[in-house]
A protein has these predicted regions:
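Alpha/beta enzyme core
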Residues: 6-17, 28-50, 54, 62-77, ...
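Extended, intrinsically disordered, low-complexity segments
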Residues: 244-282
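Glycine-rich phosphate/pyrophosphate-binding loop regions near the starts of catalytic domains
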Residues: 84
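Thr-Gly-centered strand-to-loop micro-motif
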Residues: 208-210
């Protein structure tokens, strides 16, 4: 498939042009995939199903193909994205596996020169297969379940000059570090540099990581600064855990799975409302 036909590029372009953000939901199981698609259909919103490399290692691609089939059958635009692919081997494997519309080429744990060189090489590999790409200039602090632990690495904020260097690799989207954090924000709370974000947006489409605790006001400020994709993790998955904790062993397994999926769907619908993506595909 030529890159010009890539669905993920189309939905993010539409979001940027119409000043909203696409909810990108981190899914670890079929329930998360179903919840994301059902919420998108109920709200007539685009959506992205995010899978970590863990999903490939754990289920040998089965979860990827399930996500791709769910996205294909959806009545609104839904795409499948590999988030935080951190080795050349997993990126090439995912690109050849089929099912992914986009892949995050995350070489942020390498020093800058090697990061840029690897990113350029892997972007070319993905583009040749019709797959859109994302990169992380700078380094977002913290860690995330399903991602190789980089919490001990020092965070580095993204500069406009650095963004341009990544744009020159051919990358389609950037996930800048502007005070956002993977995981918990800690005692200092949320401290974002919106001016930095806005200056980076002049060069490329922006995506946002580390957004779980953000308010609607913060989301809107980020969208105003050019963000068109927002990754969500715990907001989706905590309701699943809560249902499991409260009802496991007390109701039939089928009921448990259905109630967990319904709780996750409500969470995704709330995200859609906060990001302004509902009603975009009647």
């Amino acid at each position: 498939m030529p890159l010009t036909d890539n669905r993920a590029l189309r939905i993010l372009d539409h979001a940027a042009e119409n000043r909203y953000a696409v909810p990108a939901m981190c899914c670890y199981n079929v329930e998360g995939i179903l919840a994301t698609v059902r919420a998108a259909e109920a709200k007539r919103s685009p959506a992205m199903i995010l899978l970590f490399p863990w999903a490939v290692h754990y289920a040998d691609g089965i979860l990827v193909h399930a996500a791709a089939e769910a996205a294909r059958k959806a009545s609104v635009p839904v795409t499948v994205h590999m988030d935080h692919a951190q080795t050349p081997e997993i990126i090439r494997y995912a690109a050849d596996l089929g099912g992914f519309d986009s892949i995050m080429v995350d070489m942020s744990h390498y020093e800058k020169a090697e990061n840029l060189a690897l990113t350029r090489e892997l972007v070319e590999y993905c583009h040749a297969r019709g797959i859109a790409t994302e990169a992380e200039p700078g380094r977002i602090e913290g860690g995330e379940d399903g991602v190789a632990d980089t919490a001990d690495l020092e965070g580095m904020l993204t500069t406009p000059e650095e963004s341009q260097e990544f744009v020159d690799t051919g990358i389609d989207w950037l996930a800048p570090a502007f005070g956002n954090v993977h995981g918990e924000y800690g005692p200092r709370g949320i401290q974002l540099e919106y001016d930095r974000l806005q200056s980076i947006n002049k060069a490329v489409r922006l995506v946002l990581h580390g957004a779980d605790p953000f308010t609607q006001e913060i989301f809107q400020k980020c969208i105003d600064c050019g963000v068109s994709k927002i990754n969500i993790n715990k907001v989706l998955n905590n309701p699943y855990i809560k249902v499991q904790q409260e009802k496991a062993g007390k109701v039939p397994l089928t009921t448990l799975l259905e109630e967990a999926t319904n709780a996750m769907q409500k969470a995704v619908e709330g995200c859609i409302d906060r990001l302004g993506s509902g009603g975009r595909y009647p």
